[in-house]
Amino acid sequence: MKHITFYFDVISPYAYLAFERLPAALEGLYYKVIYQPVLFAGLLKHHGQLGPAEIEPKRAWTYRQVQWLAHDMGIDMQLPASHPFNPLALLRLVVASNPKGLPNRYVTEKLFHHVWHGGLDAEDLQRLQTLMDLLKLALNPNGPEVKELLKAHTKAAISKGVFGVPTLEVDGKLFFGLDALPMLVAYLKQDAWFAGSAWNDVLKIPVGTARQ
């Protein structure tokens, strides 16, 4: 059985779509998914990147594209009342659902639906309280243990080369993005391409120029 780690932040519409698409994509395969929440902003800061919603033309395109993708894949999705928003409270809830900070699929789904269903305010305090009551948390979401677990999850992801969400890891290989799901499935089905040198050969390509 393959163990797949799904790195996600609920702020990402692509992570939500990948989450919803994953069971169908992996149908017929023998696997276990570990859902690991990370702070997307922490990944961006570490790698010196801007998020797609921080570049105005890209922000508009992102929202158009994810709505089209949801429509095309038959996934229920509405943009939240505002985006980007601060996902920390939600991430701490999902971490607090399990003593090790690793939620099951049910909890992860509830958090994603909180954000991406209904077009509501993801940070609304009353909605957050309702969600907290529903999840029956194992840890105090506002306590130091949860805060440290989220930091540790993010640092662990960075140490493995994760730079964005969603990222799926299996056998030490990283598959980034919703559009990488077919590539992941091909790997799990032992596609012959992965037995070649192409995966590692890209690391040998020299940088021709760099921005100053």
Task: Show where each model-derived region lies.
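A short, charged/proline- and glycine-enriched loop
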Residues: 1-2
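C-terminal cap of thioredoxin/glutaredoxin-like
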Residues: 5, 11-31, 99-102, 110-212
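Structural alpha/beta surface segment adjacent to cysteine/selenocysteine redox centers
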Residues: 10, 16-115, 198-212
